[in-house]
From Swiss-Prot:
Species of provenance: Ureaplasma parvum serovar 3 (strain ATCC 700970)
Keywords assigned: Metal-binding
Molecular function GO labels: metal ion binding
GO cellular component: cytoplasm
Family assignment from sequence similarity: Belongs to the GTP cyclohydrolase I type 2/NIF3 family.
Top-level taxon of origin: Bacteria
Sequence positions that bind a divalent metal cation 1: 68, 108, 229
Name of the protein: GTP cyclohydrolase 1 type 2 homolog
Binding-site list for a divalent metal cation 2: 69, 226, 229
UniProt KW Nucleotide-binding keyword: no
Quaternary assembly: Homohexamer.
Length: 262
């Protein structure tokens, strides 16, 4: 930050007016970690907390990282030791006095959260966030499209490295009613199709047996890859820029897991 003395807690307070922490799942780590009263120099915004992202923050003199996904810290406990798989990264964060803000399911479940942001970027109309399942947003396209067409739009808008869909539905060209669940949402598929009579559900992270299940139920699903959630970076960047104006010194990090497909 340049002109104003802004604390990490100030930024959290601003963001949580739109993305209420009370909406977060009980198992999820949302909120501010490490030093809430730290005066912020610069801010790094990312999808995940990785070594590359932390290095970017250090390079940019950023002492606050805002991420969608919490720092991965699987813990194995016994009577003698607590072992965190990311202990080296945690130590690097502490050494460089970097605070963290995570907005995961608190962001996803908000009225203008992940699925709603995705639906708007795809140009869906008559948008509705489901009252029973806040992660589900349903909308419509003015003109019917094919799976192939909407997949290409998703890849362009969300920077998804790979899009998957069942070839059974490839020839259908009048798909209009679409449900979106950002992240891993296949477990909600049955409910979404049954209550909304969807032509298509767009989500991520389907496993082999999920595809078998979806085909047996004649459910048309697009797997847009979890990296599609990288739109979080732009959303938070824009929100902070509008609020803080020239006082904000914001940086973006997109850390992509490099997986080869043969």
């Amino acid at each position: 930050m340049k002109k104003m003395d802004i604390k990490a807690q100030d930024i959290l307070n601003f963001l949580t007016k739109k993305y209420d922490l009370s909406k977060a799942e009980a198992w999820d780590k949302n909120g501010l970690f490490f030093d809430e009263q730290q005066t912020i120099n610069n801010v790094q915004i990312a999808l995940d907390i990785t070594d590359d992202v932390v290095n970017d923050a250090i390079l940019n003199n950023a002492n606050l990282i805002i991420s969608h996904h919490p720092l991965f810290t699987n813990q194995d406990s016994n009577d003698e030791v607590n072992y965190f798989v990311n202990i080296d990264l945690i130590e690097k964060i502490k050494k460089n006095k970097i605070s963290l803000i995570h907005l995961h399911t608190a962001f996803d479940a908000s009225a203008n959260g992940m699925s709603m942001q995705m639906a708007k970027r795809l140009g869906l109309l008559n948008l509705k966030q489901d009252e029973q399942n806040p992660y589900l947003v349903v909308g419509e396209l003015k003109l019917g499209v094919s799976v192939d067409y909407i997949s290409r739009i998703i890849k362009q808008k969300f920077l998804s490295p790979i899009i998957k869909y069942n070839n059974v539905f490839r020839l259908e060209t009048n798909l209009k009613k679409i449900g979106i669940i950002g992240g891993s949402g296949y477990k909600f598929a049955d409910d979404a199709f049954n209550r909304y009579q969807l032509d298509m559900l767009i989500t991520s992270d389907l496993k082999y047996h999920n595809w078998l299940d979806a085909q047996a139920k004649k459910q048309n699903i697009i797997d847009m890859n979890h990296l599609s959630e990288s739109i979080f970076i732009d959303v938070i960047y824009d929100e902070l820029t509008k609020f803080y104006g020239n006082d904000a010194n914001l940086n973006k990090s997109l850390s992509i897991i490099k997986i080869n497909y043969i």
